[in-house]
Amino acid sequence: MKKNTILLALSALMSLSAVAENQPFLTKVYDFMSAPGQFVNTMPDAEAGDAKESILKRVEEAICGRYEENDWGQMEMIYKPGMISLGSYGGYVVVGFDHPVVNVKGDYDFQIFGNAFLSSQYGSGGSSEPGIVMVSYDANGNGLPDDPWYELAGSEYNSPKTQHNYTITYYKPDENKVKTPDPNNKSIIDNTYIRWTSNDVNPDSISGYVYKNSFHAQSYWPQWAEGETITFTGSKLCNNATDVSGKGTYWVQWNKGWGYVDNRPDYDPYSPHTDLDSAVMNRGFKIDWAVDANGVPVHLPMVHFIKVHNAVNQYCGWLGETSTEVAGGIDFHPNQALPEVTAGDTNGDGVVDVSDVTLVINFILGQKPIGYNPVAVDVNGDGIVDVSDVTSLINLILK
């Protein structure tokens, strides 16, 4: 009896120790706004009048991890409890861990899970609904994702088919309007349901509709959204779907190269896909891929916030719109020591000297060098990079 009591006590202590460490799974949802789509208001559930705070709580329950006691009285890590849909192009979620994610040079830093899979017939395609990842450093230290965002430049970032600063606006529908069924597709019961307009460079794609299908009867407009319109701006990838049947019955969404959520089957260190070649997997995401708004690579020693948005504006017949799904996330090295951030070390070489002054001056003149630290260039922390930062940097050197 005493032996069993001791074993139970040790088990409890080990469980508490595990919980006390930095957790590898997502722990916080800061923001969520889906674009209209067939899974909106069901992933997660939402009804008219729901407050956004309650929606964020439901999203946390769906994609943030936790520990639960299993049948043997042990605390078991649940890191992929459910899934959410981001809807059509632009829908996004902003998440974080209970610690900053450290940029480990040359390594994959974190994973965001989707539900992509490969077709047994088409090896480089199947279900691929790519989402772009952005990261942010909490420069002002207020614990909120209100600092600049940096896109993780995936394989398609520099493609001539990728549109940056793409903007789309969706217009709230009249749910009681007369429906317009698609004469060529009986599954589409209203092909003028939710109107959208955009600044697409393709004249044929400036405007269109989110269709309503016969499989999902609820409203496709996010019920917690305020106002009559929803607007999103970001990078947009080219469409990736093909009707391989030629008659609308079999659609294949082809994988993008790398660097996108819900694009390929995911590498999962806690449940590895031993039956898949690592070359066809989404290995994860590197903070080293971060670029600024002008596409210049930047060095972020760590990040506090992660944002995922649906990167394509595409409709696939009876399958409906292409909508990125998010099913949780993990930090590959949650207990990595936080790097020392030296004030004024704008080029990240560990030393504050005249080369940092030169970098800040060039930054002010619009000449941003590859690999600069976008947080450190604002030496005095006033949110503006100007001559006062040069003065502050010189004072640091002279100390």
Set out the residue ranges of the language-model regions.
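Predominantly extracellular/luminal cell-surface or secreted proteins
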Residues: 134-138
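Bacterial N-terminal signal peptides
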Residues: 8-15
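Cellulosome-associated attachment modules in secreted, modular CAZymes
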Residues: 338-399
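Short, solvent-exposed secondary-structure capping/transition elements
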Residues: 121-125, 141-152
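A domain-level signal for the mature, folded cores of soluble proteins
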Residues: 21-129, 154-339
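Positively charged n-region of N-terminal signal peptides that target proteins for export
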Residues: 1-5
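Sec/Tat signal peptide C-region and signal peptidase I cleavage site
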Residues: 16-20
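Acidic, glycine-anchored loop motifs typical of Ca2+
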Residues: 139-148, 166, 177-179, 187, ...
